[in-house]
């Protein structure tokens, strides 16, 4: 079975902003590979597969201190995700998808049983795309409930985001997570919410490179500066 890059990046639906899922999907038999490089010599790898025209699944795994002479610190488990689009986008209505993702971002806190940035857990998201002179623009609104509640904060929360194309090869990303599930006494957040932004370059029909600034509002005392991350993405078909 061969994996063949067959789509231009700009023709693919954005499945994710920086962290926030959208209502976008991989095509049937589509393959997505992701590598994220984050602080603490951390690497997070993910594989997603389009099972049919309205659904996809994925797995991910990673860890920190992968380089250097420190003890390797792997995440405690392989994480899973799935997404189904329940409503197709129309001229006046957004696409609507529901899904589940157990993968959070950053290092895993063994005491609180959570990632630095909690996973979205179960979520519903609406996405609407528009064509503008410079390129497409997508608006996204979601609500979610994470199951990483070892800190005692299990509130529902939500997020908003936008992706804007600048020509054929560059996309600017921005998202704001309200962080309502990360503002209790034992939480890592401090109530400001999480604002992330990024820029994504299409390198070829199969590859994209992305640079992200995360937690720009510096939500939480453990974040004196925004996080800088690098992401490499591959798209193909099997």
Residues covered by each model-derived region:
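N-terminal signal peptide c-region/cleavage motif recognized by signal peptidases
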Residues: 3-5
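Transmembrane beta-barrel domains of Gram-negative outer membranes and organellar outer membranes
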Residues: 7-137, 143-148, 163-171, 175-238
């Amino acid at each position: 079975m061969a994996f063949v890059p067959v789509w231009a990046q700009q023709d693919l639906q954005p499945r994710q902003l920086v962290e926030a899922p959208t209502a976008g999907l991989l095509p049937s038999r589509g393959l997505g590979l992701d590598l994220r490089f984050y602080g603490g010599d951390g690497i997070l790898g993910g594989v997603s597969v389009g099972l049919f025209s309205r659904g996809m699944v994925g797995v991910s795994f990673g860890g920190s201190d992968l380089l250097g002479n420190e003890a390797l610190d792997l995440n405690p488990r392989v994480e899973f995700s799935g997404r189904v689009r329940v409503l197709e986008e129309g001229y006046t209505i957004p696409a609507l998808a529901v899904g589940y993702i157990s993968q959070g971002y950053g290092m895993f806190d063994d005491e609180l049983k959570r990632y630095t940035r909690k996973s979205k857990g179960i979520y519903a998201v609406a996405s609407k795309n528009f064509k503008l002179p410079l390129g497409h623009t997508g608006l996204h609104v979601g609500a979610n409930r994470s199951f990483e509640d070892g800190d005692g904060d299990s509130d529902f929360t939500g997020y908003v985001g936008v992706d804007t194309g600048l020509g054929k090869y560059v996309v600017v990303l921005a998202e704001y997570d309200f962080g309502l599930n990360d503002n209790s006494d034992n939480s890592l957040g401090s109530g400001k919410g999480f604002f992330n932004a990024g820029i994504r370059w299409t390198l070829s029909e199969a590859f994209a490179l992305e640079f992200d600034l995360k937690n720009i509002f510096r939500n939480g005392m453990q974040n004196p500066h925004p996080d800088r991350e690098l992401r490499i993405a591959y798209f193909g078909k099997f």
